[in-house]
Amino acid sequence: MSTLDLFASPTPAPMPPASVIERIAALRAELDLHAHRYYVLDEPSIPDAEYDRLFKELQALEAAHPELLTPDSPTQRVGGKPLGQFASVRHRIPMLSIRTETDTEATGARNFDTRVRKELGLKESDPPVEYVAELKFDGLAMSLRYENGVLVQAATRGDGEVGEDVTQNIRTIRQIPLRLPADAPPVMEVRGEVYMRRDEFEALNERQREKIAKGAKGEKTFVNPRNAAAGGVRQLDPAFAAERRLSFFAYGVGEITPPEEGGPVFETHFELLQTLKSWCFPVAAQTRLAYGAPELIAFHEAIGRQRDQLPYDIDGVVYKVNSLALQRKMGFVSREPRWAVAHKYPAQEQLTTVLAIDIQVGRTGKLTPVAKLAPVFVGGVTVTNATLHNEDEARRKDVRVGDTVIVRRAGDVIPEVVSVLLDKRVQDAPQFSMPRQCPVCGSDAVREEGEADYRCTGGLFCAAQRKEAILHYAHKRAVEIEGLGDKLVEQLVDTGVIRTLPDLYRLGFTSLASLDRMAEKSASNLVAALEKSKQTTLPRFVFGLGIRHVGEATAKALARHFGQLDSIMDASEEQLLEVADVGPIVAKSIRTFFEQPHNREVVEQLRACGVTWEEGAPAAVAPKPLSGKTFVITGTLPGLSRDDAKDRIEAAGGKVAGSVSKKTDYVVAGLDAGSKLVKAEALGVAVIDEATLLALLDSPPDERIPA
């Protein structure tokens, strides 16, 4: 061989014959069609043996021509390698929860219809509102992302903002198409529920029992289909996920290509669902249009009668305003749509015995009576505790130790005592009464006028409140102290190592490493996490204080309005009422919290320990440099992630859109910018880089770079 031959380019592999390419495409289309008929429509059109023959033919052709293998092939539903862990996915459009109507009777539907009509400003003489009535599946919410018709990502709901990438496992669900028809939009996120059929659940548990009988280690049976489905979705090996034989129903969309970029135009939610069906997604056959409260009630009652005969678990029905224009008009409140509600059914009930009545003390000092029960299986779980809510509720039901009671899972989640069987009561059973002292710290327990609950006055001196207050402060949505979990906090408090929040920052490596079951590496990591947590934000710190009625949204509103913690601490109730989302009850709670000297002392000690955040001017006088400007980000920026850039633009008053239009002010272009950059140039939209964006963020409003 000559020297020249050594450096010659390798001969490219010949292209497969056109007949092979055409046969592979035909087999994939035919197998997809038969899978849809079998798994979605329940109308198989060929024998299983014929399906298997076609499948094996496709496998053989792909093995002979691996260059033709694609991820959307029917042969690739179970083919991924086991994962080490799941990657996080930030939802482009949050997966929000739906409000639950607590009234399980007909009045629940009437209440929702009344709220909708009031929100829309309708009179009694106006026609009924058109709704879509759907099933509320008892499964796991899922978002399926398709790009150019191919399934590219599946993500769990997570906290609504960030979920987990479970694409490999979702590919194993036969009802979910891997490729969409040609008329599907370029980008689409389909939202729905992953669930397990009851017959598959029974078969799974039977297989588990067989494994256990053969001596398999670490195997167990599952309590209910939902837990089995959730566990299947979170299997690191897709082969194990496939064994769960999960199913899927679609009920909506997230991000979707807008009409101006070639996306579909929908006027109603029902039209959207019918289109999803045409794109091969399973939609529950029970879904109906309903006009006004009477038809909502009829649907709720009809499904209630069918509930036990359905092949899968549901825990209620869902009502949605059908018109998408009216949905947009009604909007959201506290991250829940005003135009939708979940209407549940009365929970399953069982008899059991009250063994004791204990008092639990929460992080805000609330004393809650809890009935300790003889274990009973209710609604798919074993129940040993049931809340009695408060003194009035406990006395109204007259629950006593030794009573035989009816217990149910209220909303299929929180167990509660429904009633007492008085004919089975033990003679001379003493009546329950709330203690006047906190059972944890002995401080007085008081019930304020107009309140239903007793609360411990021990504040941060109460061990129960200390534990919960520290856990709340360390939560990932508050100040975030990684590694500070329940057991460690309990150990630190119970041993007297920490008594108040500032004591956390006085912990040293030596004191931590000396704790039982605390390795040196863990102690070192916690010290680093504590140091890292000192750099926080004002909203996180305010939320972390655990002020009653102050959640994340309110903490953010307070920080935006006042700009500085001292201004929040010194604000009067009247000044607090000027803040969005703050009403009289919340204002009084905030004022009461900061009127307590020990609370102010804790705040000052935390500051002295080095906890700090960036403060700004009050919203009323703080200029926002990007106010009223719309941005689109494309490509990879050199220093900022897309989420970081979006957060900074929004914090400066700007808006970040997903597509370029004539209304776009700036397109921020990074490396490998694509079609958005081309469209911006065609429309004459200003194109800037990251450096220019940073300059815009730092410039006064009147010095912005002109578009």
Swiss-Prot record:
Enzyme Commission identifier(s): 6.5.1.2
Keywords: DNA damage, DNA repair, DNA replication, Ligase, Magnesium, Manganese, Metal-binding, NAD, Zinc
Family matches, as CDD domains: BRCT_DNA_ligase_like, LIGANc
PROSITE patterns assigned to the protein according to its UniProt record, in alphabetical order: BRCT, DNA_LIGASE_N1, DNA_LIGASE_N2
Alphabetical list of Pfam families matching this protein: BRCT, DNA_ligase_aden, DNA_ligase_OB, DNA_ligase_ZBD, HHH_2, HHH_5, Nlig-Ia
GO cellular component annotations of the record: cytosol
Function of the protein: DNA ligase that catalyzes the formation of phosphodiester linkages between 5'-phosphoryl and 3'-hydroxyl groups in double-stranded DNA using NAD as a coenzyme and as the energy source for the reaction. It is essential for DNA replication and repair of damaged DNA.
The protein's name in its UniProt record: DNA ligase
Native source organism of the sequence: Polaromonas naphthalenivorans (strain CJ2)
